[in-house]
């Protein structure tokens, strides 16, 4: 797609400042992201959380404008909890992703500057990638943000749909660390979330230390 004028500026804002990774395997989904927040070329915060949870079994990764991301996160939680208290019952991961895509598409002329991965486990593992225009794709593996070209190279080379959830978590960690080494807007460490049928587990990694 050719991006012109203001759209190019928006794309640059979304790409600049983070690396997030999502991987889907048979027994779950892994979401991972670095911890650095940038303001231009300035490191604004070294310990930002970019992996968030809607429920114990549904998570998201975030890239883009912090204010817009906070609003979108609230929207996603409200979508889930509203459905839960109505006759329709809990909404599926695909349903949440589709609702968010509709919101983003409806506001594309005054867009929220975000790129979101939504992943989790309902009756099966699901992983969706959404951009600020509301485009939505279901993925087996994906990387977003300024370090995504580096991270995606690692994923392309090593992803195997038959790998275990632990192997996928290790791959996601290494993909983000590869971006940290080559992308100045990605840094500090990595949060890795393993989401499966019973809930989620979260690990934090730093260059020379596991927390």
Curated annotation (Swiss-Prot):
Primary site of residence: cytoplasm
Gene3D superfamilies on file: Glutamine Phosphoribosylpyrophosphate, subunit 1, domain 1 (3.60.20.10)
Entry GO terms, CC: cytoplasm; proteasome core complex, beta-subunit complex
Propeptide residue range(s): 1-17
GO molecular function: threonine-type endopeptidase activity
GO biological process: proteasomal protein catabolic process
EC category: hydrolase
Positions annotated as active site in the UniProt record: 18 (nucleophile)
InterPro entries noted in UniProt: Ntn_hydrolases_N, Pept_T1A_Psome_bsu_arc, Pept_T1A_subB, Proteasome_bsu_CS, Proteasome_sua/b, Proteasome_suB-type
Activity regulation details: The formation of the proteasomal ATPase PAN-20S proteasome complex, via the docking of the C-termini of PAN into the intersubunit pockets in the alpha-rings, triggers opening of the gate for substrate entry. Interconversion between the open-gate and close-gate conformations leads to a dynamic regulation of the 20S proteasome proteolysis activity.
Oxidoreductase listed as a keyword: no
Metal-binding as UniProt keyword: no
Keywords attached to this entry: Autocatalytic cleavage, Cytoplasm, Hydrolase, Protease, Proteasome, Threonine protease, Zymogen
Catalyzed reaction equations: Cleavage of peptide bonds with very broad specificity
Function per UniProt: Component of the proteasome core, a large protease complex with broad specificity involved in protein degradation.
Family: Belongs to the peptidase T1B family.
Quaternary data: The 20S proteasome core is composed of 14 alpha and 14 beta subunits that assemble into four stacked heptameric rings, resulting in a barrel-shaped structure. The two inner rings, each composed of seven catalytic beta subunits, are sandwiched by two outer rings, each composed of seven alpha subunits. The catalytic chamber with the active sites is on the inside of the barrel. Has a gated structure, the ends of the cylinder being occluded by the N-termini of the alpha-subunits. Is capped at one or both ends by the proteasome regulatory ATPase, PAN.
Protein name: Proteasome subunit beta 1
